[in-house]
């Protein structure tokens, strides 16, 4: 299958895409030894390989070894490792890195053996950013938005980035938000949004 996602970081986008596939890896990693992990899951391009990469980092593999086994460029693998490292930090009670990486509050709570409510109060909520579909050439008539963690998580040029187009709602004007009933699939688009609001 395929998935498309948008986030402020590669990690966030990757995790959103993985969740949207609604795919559970076939392997029960506790039953898979290192040899099988390397020969069956890392060395072969299967739907489970992405999850096997996370498993390898959880087991302590380094980026260079995983790159050699998979043929995946180290830049990408470093981002996978950031997710794994952030989950280890979450298990120790530090939730910010995992939240920044795009891990859900429920997943963080599971890793930390904490209540979801405790995680939600410890990490800032989400904001909605506009995708500039016209690359600044002119105002977009059909703006798209994506959710992300609030900007205080992102140091540097992303903080207070007015060009990123944060969604603001004028409370004096009536408005409506259309929320889909399930994951959006590649091939669905504006025409389905149009049908939703005109149904």
PLM features: residue spans?
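ATP-dependent carboxylate/acyl-activation modules
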Residues: 1-199
């Amino acid at each position: 299958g395929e998935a498309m996602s948008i986030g402020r970081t590669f990690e966030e986008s990757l995790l959103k895409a993985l969740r949207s596939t609604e795919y559970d890896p076939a392997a029960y990693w506790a039953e898979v030894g290192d040899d099988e992990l390397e020969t069956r899951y890392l060395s072969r391009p299967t739907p489970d390989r992405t999850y096997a990469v996370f498993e390898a980092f959880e087991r302590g593999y380094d980026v260079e070894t995983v790159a050699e086994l998979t043929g995946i460029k180290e830049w990408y693998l470093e981002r996978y490792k950031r997710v794994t490292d952030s989950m280890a930090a979450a298990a120790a009670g530090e939730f910010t890195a995992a939240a920044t990486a795009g891990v859900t509050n429920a997943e963080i709570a599971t890793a930390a053996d904490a209540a979801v409510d405790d995680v939600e109060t410890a990490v800032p909520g989400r904001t909605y950013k506009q995708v500039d579909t016209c690359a600044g050439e002119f105002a977009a008539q059909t703006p798209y938005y994506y959710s992300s963690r609030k900007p205080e998580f992102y140091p540097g040029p992303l903080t207070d980035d007015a060009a990123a187009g944060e969604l603001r709602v004028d409370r004096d004007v009536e408005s409506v938000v259309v929320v889909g009933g399930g994951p959006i699939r590649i091939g669905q688009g504006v025409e389905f949004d149009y049908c939703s609001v005109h149904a």
